[in-house]
Swiss-Prot record:
The keyword Cytoplasm does not apply. Disulfide bonds: none annotated. Substrate binds at residues 55, 112, 116, 120, 180-182. Belongs to the pyridoxamine 5'-phosphate oxidase family. InterPro entries: Pyridox_Oxase (IPR000659), Pyridox_Oxase_CS (IPR019740), Pyridox_Oxase_N (IPR011576), Pyridoxamine_oxidase_dimer_C (IPR019576), Split_barrel_FMN-bd (IPR012349). It catalyses: pyridoxamine 5'-phosphate + O2 + H2O = pyridoxal 5'-phosphate + H2O2 + NH4(+); pyridoxine 5'-phosphate + O2 = pyridoxal 5'-phosphate + H2O2. SUPFAM superfamilies: FMN-binding split barrel. This is Pyridoxine/pyridoxamine 5'-phosphate oxidase. Pfam families: PNP_phzG_C, PNPOx_N. Pathway: Cofactor metabolism; pyridoxal 5'-phosphate salvage; pyridoxal 5'-phosphate from pyridoxamine 5'-phosphate: step 1/1; Cofactor metabolism; pyridoxal 5'-phosphate salvage; pyridoxal 5'-phosphate from pyridoxine 5'-phosphate: step 1/1. Keywords: Flavoprotein, FMN, Oxidoreductase, Pyridoxine biosynthesis. Its EC number is 1.4.3.5. It comes from Brucella anthropi (strain ATCC 49188 / DSM 6882 / CCUG 24695 / JCM 21032 / LMG 3331 / NBRC 15819 / NCTC 12168 / Alc 37).
Length: 203
């Protein structure tokens, strides 16, 4: 694990730094080190936030998957912008990401969907995510119906189930320090294809 005293503020590569921190989190966090708070806004500008799981990242951005007809899916498709916040309590570190959002390719979505447990793929069909549910029995009945429907062979990916990629224009790294004199480093760029600028911030 990276030593807590290492001066991450010298880094000039935000994605490499994020990869190092995520590796540390996987060794330190007991549950879901890839969990991240995802913030969106509705058409009136009212924020929504919920936890999702980061499934991939590279120099292009941060990828997660969802139902496009869910609340988060609709808000992202409308605003085409979102923010993320990773917080690893055991490491006393935080990473904030803001940027434009795009859909992943069908090939990416198909590959990830195929890697999911069979029950999760059935669930993608059975759950009308974010819509009113009359009872637990109604959900379990839908699961049973789709389990029977796809009892043999592959389970296709629903057209409404896919992924998003946040293409960041800002990534901020935060590390807790004594007396609230924390270290903060902000990387920004004018557009998802631009060069990164870096600055330290007061805590």
């Amino acid at each position: 694990m990276t030593n807590a005293s290492d001066d991450f503020t010298e880094s000039s590569q935000p994605f490499k730094l994020f990869a190092d921190w995520l590796t540390d989190a996987k060794a330190s966090e007991p549950n879901d080190p890839n969990a991240v708070a995802l913030a969106t806004v509705d058409p009136d500008g009212l924020p929504n936030v919920r936890m999702v799981l980061l499934k991939d990242f590279d120099e292009q951005g941060f990828v997660f998957y969802t139902n496009y007809e869910s609340t988060k899916g609709k808000e992202i498709l409308s605003a085409e912008k979102a923010a993320m916040c990773f917080h690893w309590k055991t490491l006393r570190r935080q990473v904030r990401v803001r940027g434009a959002v795009e859909k992943v390719s069908d090939a990416e979505a198909d590959a990830y969907y195929a890697s999911r447990p069979r029950g999760s793929r059935i669930g993608a069909w059975a759950s009308k995510q974010s819509r009113p549910l009359e009872s637990r029995f109604a959900l379990e009945k839908a699961v049973a119906e789709y389990t029977a429907k796809y009892a043999i062979g592959d389970i296709p990916r629903p057209s409404y189930w896919s992924g998003f990629r946040i293409r960041p224009v800002s990534i901020e790294f935060w590390h807790d320090r004594a007396f609230r004199l924390h270290d903060r480093v902000l990387f920004t760029r004018p557009a998802p294809e631009g060069d990164w600028n870096k600055e330290r911030l007061y805590p």
